[in-house]
Amino acid sequence: MKKGKIRRPLSYSSIKEFMKSPNHLLSYWDREKVTTPAMLKGTLIHTLLLEPEKMEKEYATWLGGRRAGNEYKTFQEENQGKTIIKPEELEEAEKIIKNAKNNVLLNLKKGVELEILWKINLIPFRGFVDFYGDGFIGDVKTCSDASPKAFQRDFIKFKYYIQAFLYLNANETLMFAGENPDYFILAVETSPPYNSQMYKVSTEFIEKGKEEVHKALQDFEKWDGEPAGYEFYDLLEENGVITLNLPEWMQ
């Protein structure tokens, strides 16, 4: 592994990018952090659900019309450091968390938004645990459909099982959730009827996460830190071509 290759600790997000290609990881490290409306909405939901006591300190509700003009500028100055939201945005977020906040497991939590730092194969990792308690680690994921079949698709598409393995692995050293905790995901719908559902991640998925993470770390250790595309994973044939084969599910 090239010295100085690791610019910062790896994370669930960055290792997923590296699994696509080294160029994806470099782009992830280099990109400017741009806060999108979807990200703002997700943060608002997380704060309302997990840390409602921080709402007054971190948010200000703008009751006026267009976000422009002297009146709005004065409001901004009076609320420096706060995220400014509209009443309808707050109202929608409150509807979204109404069902989720009554979840039994969520109400057994002993901590939220825990920063964790640990190592796998001497490679530093960093993460943030949404909520945890004795015997469990929990994560909140917003989605359009929290039904079992639909959320399973999201779970696989976004590789949430990798995050589950990483945080369980961190707990083996840090023990913030006790011995041998289970991993849960609270899926929260962001559109009517705003259902929520708690899912336990199976041992099979945890093992799948472990397998993919360790394979990615083997590749990461081989990487010289220089830009590389899909050829890094030996997928190319002659003349830089990749053959698209029939996937197993179509056979």
Model-derived segments and spans:
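Metal-dependent nuclease catalytic cores that hydrolyze phosphodiester bonds in DNA/RNA
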Residues: 1-126, 235-236
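Secondary-structure boundary elements
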Residues: 102-108, 133-139, 172-181
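Short, well-structured alpha-helical interface segments that form or flank functional binding sites
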Residues: 40, 126, 159-162, 166, ...
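Short helix/strand-bridging catalytic loops that position acidic/His residues to coordinate divalent metals
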Residues: 146-158, 202
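Coil-to-beta-strand transition motifs
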Residues: 122-126, 133-135, 191-194
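Hydrophobic/aromatic-lined pockets within catalytic cores
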Residues: 49-54, 142-145, 172-176, 221
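Metal-dependent nuclease catalytic regions and adjoining charged, substrate-binding loops involved
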Residues: 90, 166-251
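Conserved catalytic cores of phosphodiester-cleaving nucleases, focusing on short active-site segments
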Residues: 112, 127-150
